[in-house]
């Protein structure tokens, strides 16, 4: 995959499902401009966006209920979205999937700490020379077991 030249020097909002995603909505309602908005997973079913990052295999949503509450939203996104939806593997049932350019990103940027979807989106922005990255909703906390997955952080240290 080649770099997306139109991203160079741009301002991007990356929006995940954590509590601070409401701050994205507040920013937009107060006139804050982003050249592009990138949705993480099921946020793609809720807000306007230009790109989706979903580093789970599509089969996780299409063939299982492993994603819990995200399952129905992601099935809709995967079957209807024209893309790009950057992911780890392609699936013929999903028209908008684009395989994430992992080799190019790692080789060109020396970014190796890619352990969740937000980190992949940030690395993609870095690889494409995005000037400003605004993170919303990447503060992951879960009811019951407050920080069981990402330890409450976006893993983009």
Residue ranges and their predicted role:
Residues 1-157:
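Metal-ion/cofactor- or nucleotide/acyl-coenzyme-handling active-site neighborhoods
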